[in-house]
Amino acid sequence: MTLSVLSRKDKERVIRRLLLQAPPGEFVNAFDDLCLLIRDEKLMHHQGECAGHQHCQKYSVPLCIDGNPVLLSHHNVMGDYRFFDHQSKLSFKYDLLQNQLKDIQSHGIIQNEAEYLRVVLLCALKLYVNDHYPKGNCNMLRKTVKSKEYLIACIEDHNYETGECWNGLWKSKWIFQVNPFLTQVTGRIFVQAHFFRCVNLHIEISKDLKESLEIVNQAQLALSFARLVEEQENKFQAAVLEELQELSNEALRKILRRDLPVTRTLIDWHRILSDLNLVMYPKLGYVIYSRSVLCNWII
């Protein structure tokens, strides 16, 4: 069935689904390609706006406001396609297709102990990110849910090399409740890479974590939290590199329904691992092996 015979509602669903499949750094390219097929500017603009908003949340798209990095995520969404930045105390809309902030408004925040703690933790997190990532960005967000205060740390680094036929993203988030004495940190680390020379290879690797953290005072908590993030990300990177090294031709044949064509001889695995290392920059630590890799090959 072609797009021309689909109802408008079905077209909207297909367009949005295709746009949401765009890898990090490739949303605008996917949108432009679809525009050539759809040839309905109004429909594409509306779906691009909706899908772009979701894409920003999914991949923690970084912005810069007043010289400070801002990571977009569902944790700082306000509704009506708006985001909120604690640092600048601004709310805004972001047009991913035009890479432009829109409808910027001031937005006050409550200055309480949780806010002071957020600022201290952000300073410690910035020191860690600047030391471990080539072009890393981080945010520390605060949220109140049922009268309980939560702090959310977000980290992102990417390297989009479309000219070299690959893109890579590393992101993580860490959430904990502001409690006296002891709190539980829930974390998730996510890596995605896309290679599109000769074959189309998508790699997604993620890991969920839970760790306890003692709370004595703000300074101690900030240092302990940054140390926890460093240890867990180091372990994760070491496990990722070990797992990628196991993706030899023999291992790939076992997960493929058919052998790769002759063009597989052009794949330079050493270069791929070297390129990935530019994205996954944290220093190596102890290895915790975790098998959670999804590889999709489209010949």
From Swiss-Prot:
The protein's name: F-actin-capping protein subunit alpha-3
Species: Homo sapiens
PROSITE patterns in the cross-refs: F_ACTIN_CAPPING_A_1, F_ACTIN_CAPPING_A_2
Similarity comment: family membership: Belongs to the F-actin-capping protein alpha subunit family.
Keyword Cytoplasm on entry: yes
Pfam families: F-actin_cap_A
Subcellular location(s) per record: Cytoplasm, Cytoskeleton
Keyword field: Actin capping, Actin-binding, Cytoplasm, Cytoskeleton, Phosphoprotein
